[in-house]
Regions:
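C-terminal accessory module of base-excision DNA glycosylases/AP lyases that mediates lesion recognition
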Residues: 1-52, 126-135, 143-266
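Structure-specific DNA junction-binding interface
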Residues: 1-123
Length: 266
């Protein structure tokens, strides 16, 4: 098992953040502008958040696996997809939960408002089943405050929580559940996906035996070492790993050059 100290975690974070800032500046993104990436996308700890906000995040996170964002395209086709499925806000979670996948898939195929094809049936079935399961779970809550309280509040951190949620939602694994939580504003969670796992392995913080739960704890420890949310640590590494400054117009190849630069400095 890989070992590390608090000082090593702080050193890696400082190097990573400085590295990202430098590369961002080369593309015209200032340190101040970079900070916008450290804000959760669907923060429910704001005055106007509702359970609809939570469901929208579910529908987005459900597609955040391998190639599915290029199939579902929920971020670009949200209105078309919801219209095709007959879903309107405020969502009626009890009614949505009564659906079955084949019925919803047929609605998509028959809709004139939804121009994208559904030839990737397996991906759509996974996504639609998740949409049904998540509606069933949300139907247990009367309001957003009940939902937030059930998860322990904005600054909570309990790896058992994403584990329990993932069992309620079909094909919603541990990493996707963490993605869902962090983008809702539960800022002490990160997403232990392939990008983060490969990054930590390259930095010799993990090995092939390290679990997703352990990756989650390492990122939390690194965040604590510099007094920032785990969300921020996650996003720094994610931006380096994916090359995707999605709130700006440029993309960069950063992960390998970052790892090489850090290891060279040691």
């Amino acid at each position: 098992m890989a070992t590390y100290t608090k000082n090593q975690l702080k050193q890696i974070y400082d190097f990573a953040y400085a590295y990202l800032q430098k590369r961002a500046q080369q593309q015209g993104i200032s340190p101040h502008e970079l900070e916008k990436y450290f804000n959760p996308l669907n923060n429910i700890f704001t005055p106007n958040a509702t359970l609809d906000t939570v469901y929208d995040r579910f529908l987005m996170s459900l597609q955040n696996r391998s190639y599915m964002p290029n199939v579902i395209k929920y971020d670009n086709n949200k209105d078309k997809i919801l219209s095709a499925l007959g879903l309107k806000t405020p969502y009626n979670f009890q009614e949505i939960a009564k659906n079955d996948v084949e019925r919803l898939l047929t609605k998509l195929k028959n809709s004139k408002n939804f121009s994208d094809n559904t030839k990737f049936k397996k991906s759509w079935k996974i996504w639609l089943q998740g949409a049904i399961d998540s509606a069933k779970w949300l139907s247990e809550f009367n309001n957003i405050e009940e939902f937030k309280s059930s998860l322990g509040g904005q600054h909570s951190f309990n790896p058992d929580i994403p584990q329990k949620i993932s069992k309620k939602i079909t094909s919603f694994g541990f990493a996707l559940t963490c993605d869902f939580l962090k983008e809702l504003g539960f800022i002490n969670y990160s997403k232990p996906d392939v990008h983060l796992i490969n990054m930590l392995k390259g930095l010799k913080l993990t090995d092939k035996h390290t679990s997703e739960q352990e990756v989650l704890r390492i990122i939390k420890e690194m965040a604590d070492s510099v007094n920032v949310p785990a969300y921020q640590v996650d996003k720094i590494f994610w931006l380096i790993a994916t090359e995707n400054f999605y709130l700006d117009s440029n993309k960069h190849s950063l992960r390998e050059t970052f790892i090489q630069s850090y290891n060279k400095e040691k």
